Amino acid sequence: MIKLVLVDLDGTLTEDRESTRIDLDAIYAIRLLQKSGIKVSLVSGNSYPILRGLYTYLYLDGGFVAENGCIVFYKEKYRMCRQMEQSLVDEFKSLFKLRDTWQNEYRECDFGFVPAKITDEMINWAKERNLYIKSSGYAVHIAYNPAGKRIGVEKLLQLLGLKKEDVAAIGDSSTDIELFQQVGFKVAVGNADDELKDIADYITSNKSGKGVREFVDKLLKGEFDGIK
């Protein structure tokens, strides 16, 4: 039985992958889950202040994971990754002629840069320094993080006292692959990256936030074999 749904933010809860506007159908879907007794958590690469604000104003109850797994919140804040030295941030940005994302000012462990394209040279640079590097499609992220979103989701499930089999997740990006590794039922929205669709248990016909609504409607109607 599903007791928790983990929802990515950009490209999943929003109207589409190019928008920062939260989809109203997705908000309605969250309310339907909560009314049925299923908790909802956000899992995102966004910074802690962004997730904390959304968590409060969307009136969520299942905690959240920020900075691609590096920050977890449930009743209190937990830092799962070592903080990044500013000298490394500056070196990476300067060497590859990148720009800070606007959220870097508020980040602690996982930093994002644009353009969002990763090169072999970037991968080698990160590997030499034992850094995680990945593109979300919105930015290139670097952090002292061995497991991406998985490290934060593991902690959150521990805090909530839930097993992998109790949890479903919905996302759109290759950064959600690590998220999918920690849940029992995996959903990719219709406009998700192909590599995420390849491992999904269900792919919505609708994109982004409308896909969230589609999944929730089917879940609550009991249309997925083996889960309720």
Swiss-Prot record:
<protein>
    <recommendedName>
        <fullName>Phosphoglycolate phosphatase 1</fullName>
        <ecNumber>3.1.3.18</ecNumber>
    </recommendedName>
</protein>
<feature type="binding site">
    <location>
        <position position="149"/>
    </location>
    <ligand>
        <name>substrate</name>
    </ligand>
</feature>
<feature type="binding site">
    <location>
        <position position="172"/>
    </location>
    <ligand>
        <name>Mg(2+)</name>
    </ligand>
</feature>
<feature type="binding site">
    <location>
        <position position="8"/>
    </location>
    <ligand>
        <name>Mg(2+)</name>
    </ligand>
</feature>
<dbReference type="GO" id="GO:0008967">
    <property type="term" value="F:phosphoglycolate phosphatase activity"/>
</dbReference>
<feature type="binding site">
    <location>
        <position position="176"/>
    </location>
    <ligand>
        <name>Mg(2+)</name>
    </ligand>
</feature>
<keyword id="KW-0479">Metal-binding</keyword>
<feature type="active site" description="Nucleophile">
    <location>
        <position position="8"/>
    </location>
</feature>
<dbReference type="InterPro" id="IPR036412">
    <property type="entry name" value="HAD-like_sf"/>
</dbReference>
<dbReference type="InterPro" id="IPR023214">
    <property type="entry name" value="HAD_sf"/>
</dbReference>
<keyword id="KW-0378">Hydrolase</keyword>
<keyword id="KW-0460">Magnesium</keyword>
<dbReference type="InterPro" id="IPR006382">
    <property type="entry name" value="PGPase"/>
</dbReference>
<keyword id="KW-0119">Carbohydrate metabolism</keyword>
<dbReference type="Pfam" id="PF08282">
    <property type="entry name" value="Hydrolase_3"/>
</dbReference>
<dbReference type="GO" id="GO:0000287">
    <property type="term" value="F:magnesium ion binding"/>
</dbReference>
<feature type="binding site">
    <location>
        <position position="10"/>
    </location>
    <ligand>
        <name>Mg(2+)</name>
    </ligand>
</feature>
<dbReference type="GO" id="GO:0005829">
    <property type="term" value="C:cytosol"/>
</dbReference>
<comment type="similarity">
    <text>Belongs to the archaeal SPP-like hydrolase family.</text>
</comment>
<comment type="function">
    <text>Catalyzes the dephosphorylation of 2-phosphoglycolate.</text>
</comment>
<dbReference type="GO" id="GO:0016791">
    <property type="term" value="F:phosphatase activity"/>
</dbReference>
